Swiss-Prot record:
Region spans: Disordered: 1-21, 73-130, 154-249, 451-470
Composition skew (Low complexity), residue ranges: 458-470
DNA-binding region coordinates: 28-60
Biased composition (Basic and acidic residues): 73-82
Record's function text: Transcription factor that specifically regulates the expression of the gene cluster that mediates the biosynthesis of the cytotoxic leucine-containing cytochalasans, including aspochalasin C, aspochalasin E, TMC-169, flavichalasine F, aspergillin PZ, aspochalasin M and flavichalasine G.
GO cellular component, one term: nucleus
Protein name (Swiss-Prot/TrEMBL): Transcription factor ffsR
Gene Ontology molecular-function annotations: DNA binding; DNA-binding transcription factor activity, RNA polymerase II-specific; zinc ion binding
Length: 612
């Protein structure tokens, strides 16, 4: 007779034994990542790929699935094991047959930081009495040490006083040290991370992970501190005061946005030269001083002008070489019989329809030369000696008002005794100003004995001041252009004159080859293209374009001559200019200043007469 037995409940059924390969997922990795149903026949073979992977011609893999949760044995025994600890779960599966015998967990498996943060702060010491329990987390870089602490081999920390760190509430959250086994010589540490890691320790943990030693220094340098030793929170606007010798256990910076890079002085510093007057303000290409807010010195301004003149000279030389080459080629390749005026002017001026128009580059170069010369003339005077007139005059006036009757050849004892008899209270303790005045009077007396100037005495009165002013004025000379300035200005000046001469020579030759009435012909090419006056274009008025070019060129030449007034009068500039004109075969005026513009002005006048 068959007896009916009571059905066993699910909790009383023994758990099924697991194989060494652990449980396997039904869906493959590719279908799980795409969230698709895996059409895989497990009845045929466990190693056969699914239909989707076979169709995509990819390798079908199934990752191992580790059981998550507590085993019935652990629930029955009541052991405090966290449900998210894979190490403990795997250990419980391996010891399912003998749940009371717990072997030490192996650290060969892979652990994640998430599982470490979810671990309890203190391990259970059940069945672990008399021995040290190892931490399931095998890394040490999750500990957030303070900047002044060092981890010793005995588990203690050394460094600056930690204040409230001694009670275990500081940045060193894990219990260091614990207990030491009596039968072993090595020390084991429980370095379990805390349950809640502060947000401020994330950069420090990253620094420990990557080995970056400069992170702590950057964090400390970004904290604004007050005079009382407190740390100011830039986000909350609060100041925490700490007693002397005690380091706060609070996080250094409690907000992630507080780690923004500080503003540098390079962005906010003023542009050098902005404080110059409006009349003599240099352009943006002038050199800047290394110190922010300082005005460039006259020497730097002059060097910048010379550099710009050198660049302009190189550009003008290229333009001059181009126009001379075109003029020579046009003259030799074509004869006046088969050469039209339009073709001649077009080839000589290198294409008036392009940006390389010789007329446009001539006027543009003249404008740049005028701008640089105006700035060059506005440079302040440079003294030829380090002793300036105001300082010397002030020292001489102070020495004259001192009223000392000391002979130059007397000794100091006689001098001080004389001052004491006259009741001068400064004889006992002479000030540095008095000593400077005395040295200045000695210098003046030495110059008088040497025949370089009259000696200064107390009886000269007002004449001493005028003598001092005259002597001091010899230290400052009138500004004269130096040799580099003269050479670079002369180079630009001669190139411009040669370009003007070549352009108007070509225009004159074109007008000579034109019909008798040049005002009615249309064979003259454009010299001033796309010029209009409120919609009135000059396309059909070729001679009017030449007249406008004559007026503009005359104005530019007059402006250049006026700006070079002081430089043209220099003897060295005149000598070099006359030498160049002799080499070119130009006529030189015997009297007066030589400007070199006479040949260009004659050409302009002849062209203007032909258009009249």
């Amino acid at each position: 007779m068959d007896t009916l037995t009571a059905p066993t409940t699910q909790s009383e059924q023994p758990p099924p034994p697991l194989t060494a390969s652990l449980s396997r997922r039904y869906a493959c990795d590719r279908c799980r990542s795409h969230k698709l149903r895996c059409n895989r026949d497990l009845m045929t073979s466990t190693n056969s790929p699914c239909q989707r992977c076979r169709k995509a011609r990819v390798k079908c893999t199934i990752g191992a699935s580790i059981r998550v949760g507590l085993s019935p044995e652990e629930l029955k025994n009541g052991e405090n094991v966290h449900r998210a600890s894979p190490g403990r779960s795997a250990g419980s599966h391996r010891t399912a047959s003998t749940p009371s015998n717990h072997a030490p967990r192996s650290h060969g498996r892979t652990f994640t930081p998430e599982s470490a943060h979810q671990a309890p702060p203190y391990p259970s010491n059940r069945s672990m009495s008399g021995s040290m329990r190892l931490s399931p987390v095998p890394w040490l870089d999750m500990i957030s040490f303070d900047g002044a602490q060092e981890l010793n081999f005995d588990g203690s920390t050394s460094g600056l006083p930690m204040g409230s760190h001694t009670n275990g509430s500081g940045p060193l959250h894990a219990p260091m040290g614990g207990s030491t086994s009596s039968n072993t010589s090595s020390t084991f540490l429980d370095v379990r991370p805390p349950l809640h890691t502060p947000a401020s320790s994330k950069p420090q943990q990253e620094a420990w992970r990557t080995g970056d030693d400069s992170t702590d220094l950057r964090l400390l340098s970004q904290i604004p501190r007050t005079r009382g030793g407190g740390v100011t929170d830039p986000a909350a606007g609060l100041t925490q005061q700490h007693p002397a010798g005690v380091t706060s256990s609070a996080p250094l910076v409690s907000h992630d946005h507080a780690f923004a890079p500080p503003q540098t002085s390079i962005i906010s510093e003023p542009i050098p030269g902005d404080d110059l007057p409006a009349g003599g303000r240099p352009p943006t290409w002038f050199p800047a001083r290394s110190r922010a807010g300082s005005t460039p010195s006259p020497t730097e301004l002059k060097d910048a002008c010379i550099q710009k003149l050198s660049d302009l000279s190189a550009s003008l030389m290229k333009d001059l070489d181009l126009i001379i080459t075109c003029k020579t080629a046009s003259s030799f390749l074509f004869t006046p019989s088969d050469k039209t005026a339009a073709g001649y002017l077009f080839k000589t001026l290198d294409g008036s329809m392009t940006e390389d128009n010789a007329v446009a580059r001539m006027l543009y170069g003249s404008e740049r030369f005028l701008d640089i010369i105006k700035l060059f003339n506005q440079l302040p005077s440079l003294p030829s000696s380090s002793l300036s007139m105001p300082a010397a005059a002030a020292a001489a006036a102070a020495a004259a008002s001192y009223g000392s009757t000391r002979p130059v050849d007397s000794d100091d004892a006689y001098y001080y005794s004389d001052l004491e008899d006259t009741g001068d209270i400064r004889s006992r303790n002479p000030t540095p100003e008095d000593r400077g005045n005395e040295q200045w009077s000695i210098l003046q007396a030495y110059l008088g004995r040497a025949g370089q100037g009259p000696p200064m005495g107390p009886s000269q009165g007002s004449s001493s001041r005028s003598t001092t002013t005259n002597c001091s004025s010899s230290f400052v000379e009138v500004q004269k252009p130096d040799v580099p300035s003269i050479l670079v200005i002369l180079s630009c000046y001669t190139c411009l004159l040669k370009i003007y001469e070549t352009v108007f020579f070509v225009i004159q030759h074109v007008l000579e080859c034109s019909p008798a009435n040049p005002s009615g012909t249309t064979d003259i090419p454009h010299t001033v293209r796309d010029l209009n006056i409120n919609g009135f274009f000059l396309q059909n008025h070729r001679t009017l374009q030449i007249k406008i070019l004559i007026q503009v060129s005359t104005y530019m030449l007059d402006s250049i001559q006026k700006s070079l007034g002081t430089i043209l009068s220099d003897s060295m500039f005149q000598a070099l200019l006359k030498t160049l004109m002799k080499e070119e075969g130009c006529t030189i005026t015997s009297q007066g200043e030589e400007t070199g513009m006479q040949g260009v002005r004659d050409l302009i006048r002849r062209v203007e007469e032909m258009l009249a």
